[in-house]
Amino acid sequence: MKFDSRVMLNSANNNSPQHPVSAPSDINMNGYNRKLPQKRGYEMPKYSDPKKKMCKERIPQPKNTVAMLNELRHGLIYKLESQTGPVHAPLFTISVEVDGQKYLGQGRSKKVARIEAAATALRSFIQFKDGAVLSPLKPAGNLDFTSDEHLENGIENLSSSKMFEIIQTMLTEKLSNPTSLEQPTFCMSQNVSKSAITVDGQKKVPDKGPVMLLYELFNDVNFECINIDGAQNNCRFKMTVTINEKKFDGTGPSKKTAKNAAAKAALASLCNISYSPMVVPQKNVPLPIDDKSSSMELPQIHADTIGRLVLEKFMEVIKGQEAYSRRKVLAGIVMTENMNFCEAKVISVSTGTKCVSGEHMSVNGAVLNDSHAEIVSRRCLLKYLYAQLDLQCNQATAYQSIFVRNTDGQYPYKLKSGVHFHLYINTAPCGDARIFSPHENDTGVDKHPNRKARGQLRTKIESGEGTIPVKSSDGIQTWDGVLQGQRLLTMSCSDKIARWNIVGIQGSLLSSIIEPVYLHSIVLGSLLHPEHMYRAVCGRIEKSIQGLPPPYHLNKPRLALVTSAEPRNQAKAPNFGINWTIGDTELEVVNSLTGRTIGGQVSRITKQAFFVKYGFLMANLPGILVRKVTTDYGQTKANVKDYQIAKLELFSAFKREDLGSWLKKPIEQDEFGLAE
């Protein structure tokens, strides 16, 4: 029997006691016909059984140390021992008694202190393989459990027998360090997101900014702007962050940039967290040839140390001659022994961006053809290598040299084991390493790796900046052609660094005395693009290089970018450059256009100067079998057969890759003799 709502309405209006009406059970008190979900002819998802919803299978979450301890020991009581510190930052101490022994834990909240007390108790009767961390109280974020990478985020369905190993790999350093309880402000906060560091030890770029991450990791973080240099339109800010009385500096064109740089330096030093573009695995950036288990990245703290040492040395040597402090490119070479950066030495410092003018070419090797900073720094290193071989000429000083006798090798001398050289440049070297847009796909994979512009040999332009492909040049350079007005072209710095990674940085003359010396790392102050930089310095010929005589090989230096990147300098490049080598009493200022010092003298790092030093070594160095030196400089270089073979194989590799032909200076430049 159907019920008509009009009956109820009529009866309500009549208020007649003779017509009592009782509403059915499926009608609410407002008079609307709303059937229960069970009586409807169809089902709606939102009316699903609530009991079934509660029974939905859940993914098991990791247990913290309190839960672990409660499973192993029942009836434990946690007591609040004390509360110290200010109101806004209290420090709680909680104890738990297990098997008659009391264990303490401290934290910024009672919950954290209880977890630490439980962890201390667990460590007393469970033997761990290594020291380790607490498992997180909650997942770091929304996780994709279908992904193979979900284990890195700390969520894993493990049995209780394996949970102890998880505790070991996830405890904070504070628990493994007894003194940490005395210094709670230096310990990491307990709500740190684990997404910045993976469980397997491999680093990836954090998904948070350095300042935010630093505040999450440490409780006591203080930033301070301590210095502002430069004019209003080109100022430089210096920020310092203090963490547990340790200071870390950062510089930048704005306070925000400087603050980020300081935070990056602190994270790299204290947590080994790097924001370097080299952290992200690149498609075309394979591992170094000498270490297949490591990445192409130099540790960030080492890169920052190298950059800081070079900058400090530059400021030191320029004192008193501030007029020559103007520069666009700064370079330097740092030497380490056994990778001990605490005792690293700055071998050379240089500035410069120009090449010699064609009218100032020298037939006596008395001018510097290329005054670009990185090229000059390498020539300063040559000066240092000659000085170190000089020490071998005297038995009383031989032990001070970085070289040792190579009794069982084909070369009389070799570097001591563990000696490494690191090149710093404040920007990417000119040429192939700098042919990219820094704001387009900054660190992504190159979408056009086969584009014709990629990897091309390029030349510097006389009396100018920038480079052009060698295919656009006039080919062979002649002395009379240059004097008549043809531009004198010099190979780009990217190409020369690629050459050093085949034949070494010791030059052709020293190659008859010592084994090849290679750069261990290259650190840039700005404009580091992993793929472009790797391709420029070694990647473009790695598939085509062949036939190198041992011990010559393709060297793959580690790459890094400093945290305090240098801003783009729009000022006009000066026509001079400076150079300094360890042991020099003062710096040398060279006019880049003439290739001579500003006083018109011959520079101390010219071909002529090195040929004289080479002649002295050949006459006095112990262990030299053939001491006769050809009076012609070019012929002496040609007599170093293995070096020449390696160099020709390099040129052939570029040709096989269709990257152009290596452009040489007029041959007359090397046709000079050894001074009597």
UniProtKB/Swiss-Prot annotation:
The lineage of its organism: Eukaryota, Metazoa, Ecdysozoa, Arthropoda, Hexapoda. SMART domains: ADEAMc, DSRM. The gene is Adar. One of its GO terms (cellular component) is cytoplasm. Its EC number is 3.5.-.-. Zn(2+) binds at residues 372, 430, 493. CDD domains: DSRM_STRBP_RED-like_rpt1 (cd19865). SUPFAM superfamilies: dsRNA-binding domain-like. This is Double-stranded RNA-specific editase Adar. Residues 348-672 form the A to I editase domain.
